[in-house]
């Protein structure tokens, strides 16, 4: 069996020069039957399976990797349950993390869960179900994610697998946030952080918790300073393990600076030592938005959104907050434009801020309803008539003050009468 170990070493040595040859050698080792009592052969085969899985994932061979996951099932009885669970999870993670989606992800995951059930491997089944919840979330099947997640949470709370419980509670928080149910998203995140405090959290999981904390603070409380701190922690965590999620955390840090009206900090962040290695279109997109925000330029803002559509619009977190920022910028521009006028043509306003007449009309209507300024739209004439700010009626405040003073007088008289008796 020493020959198998030599073959494995040869496959590893060919990784950098001839991947196909390396894959062929590993395929041969994996297909070879081994005796259960031959520990060395079993160990080499286990390593070969993982190495082959990694190579198939890197070369985008999704179908072959899915086939490998099914093919190795008989071999899993030759190794301990813990090793078998690690092997299945590793191969499934490789398959699900591949960018070349096959559409078979959910089906393969369900197959693995059924196999784990038939083999009575409870811990593996729970881990695979948690991965399926994550998959449902990624594919926007939120109700299915919540349904399966809820069942699994009840089960895990009775057991001692706190790491998996944290992962699931975090997924629950993300799902509720995606459904815009912020109170439940916050409650699930609080549960996840409480559970995480009782165990050692791997850097990846801790970074994910920090990331979600930042997202919730930004979404619910608009507390951008606290959100920035969490995103920074998440960025450092992801950066320490070379995770591709680090660039997302960096983008959210830049977004916080823009929302805090500190667009000048964006450039210093991008050119900082830690973030320099992530320079590219992702950071350039936020840099353009920061510049547009600094100049209060709607045209530059729209240009950035068009030019960097994938980087800005495809991320729901960034897209949501940039939409709000754009609305605020539009309102500020409109108020600045109409300030000198008591009566102005809508056509003239649209020319000044370089937007279509329909868009300007809709926004002005909304601002009037929200009482951002006082006026009416005369659509027949195509003009906006702006009124002076009506004087604030202070009768209510004066009445409250009078009642307050009378209350003090009555209390004082009561205390004096009490002393006399």
Swiss-Prot record:
Cell compartments where the protein resides: Nucleus; Cytoplasm, Cytosol
One of the record's GO molecular function terms: structural molecule activity
Pfam families the UniProt entry points to: PCI (PF01399), RPN6_C_helix (PF18503), RPN6_N (PF18055)
Domain called PCI: residue spans: 227-391
Keyword Repeat belongs to the record: no
UniProt entry keywords in alphabetical sequence: Cytoplasm, Nucleus, Proteasome
Subunit details: Component of the lid subcomplex of the 19S proteasome regulatory particle complex (also named PA700 complex). The 26S proteasome consists of a 20S proteasome core and two 19S regulatory subunits.
Name assigned to this protein: 26S proteasome non-ATPase regulatory subunit 11A
């Amino acid at each position: 069996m020493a020959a198998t170990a030599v073959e494995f070493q040869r496959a590893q040595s060919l990784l950098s020069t001839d991947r196909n040859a390396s894959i062929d050698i590993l395929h041969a080792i994996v297909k070879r039957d081994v005796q259960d009592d031959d520990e060395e052969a079993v160990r080499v085969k286990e390593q070969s399976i993982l190495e082959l899985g990694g190579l198939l994932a890197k070369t985008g061979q999704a179908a072959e990797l899915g086939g490998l996951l099914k093919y190795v099932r008989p071999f899993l009885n030759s190794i301990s349950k813990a090793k078998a669970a690690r092997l299945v999870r590793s191969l499934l993670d490789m398959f699900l993390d591949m960018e070349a989606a096959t559409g078979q992800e959910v089906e393969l995951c369900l197959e693995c869960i059924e196999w784990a059930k038939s083999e009575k491997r409870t811990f593996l089944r729970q881990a695979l179900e948690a991965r399926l919840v994550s998959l449902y979330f990624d594919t926007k099947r939120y109700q299915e994610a919540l349904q399966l997640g809820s069942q699994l949470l009840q089960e895990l709370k009775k057991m001692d697998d706190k790491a998996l419980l944290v992962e699931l509670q975090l997924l629950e928080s993300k799902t509720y946030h995606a459904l815009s149910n912020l109170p439940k998203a916050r409650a699930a995140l609080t549960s996840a952080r409480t559970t995480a405090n009782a165990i050692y959290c791997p850097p990846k999981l801790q970074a994910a918790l920090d990331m979600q904390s930042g997202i919730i603070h930004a979404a619910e409380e608009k507390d951008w300073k606290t959100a920035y701190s969490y995103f920074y922690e998440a960025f450092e965590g992801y950066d320490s393990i070379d995770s591709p999620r680090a660039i997302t955390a960096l983008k959210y840090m830049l977004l916080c600076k823009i929302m805090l009206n500190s667009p000048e900090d964006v450039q210093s962040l991008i050119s900082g030592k830690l973030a320099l290695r992530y320079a590219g279109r992702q950071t350039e997109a936020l840099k353009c938005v920061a510049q547009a925000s600094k100049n209060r330029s709607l045209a530059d803002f729209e240009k950035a959104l068009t030019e960097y559509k994938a980087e800005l619009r495809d991320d729901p977190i960034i897209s949501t907050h940039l939409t709000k920022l754009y609305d605020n910028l539009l309102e500020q521009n409109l108020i600045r434009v109409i300030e000198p006028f008591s009566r102005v043509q809508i056509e003239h306003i649209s020319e000044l801020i370089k937007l279509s007449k329909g868009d300007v009309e809709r926004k002005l209507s909304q601002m009037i309803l929200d009482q951002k300024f006082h006026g009416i739209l005369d659509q027949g004439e195509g003009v906006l008539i702006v009124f002076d700010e009506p004087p604030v009626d202070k009768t209510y405040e004066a009445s409250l003050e009078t009642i307050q003073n009378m209350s003090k007088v009555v209390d004082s008289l009561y205390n004096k009468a009490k002393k006399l008796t």
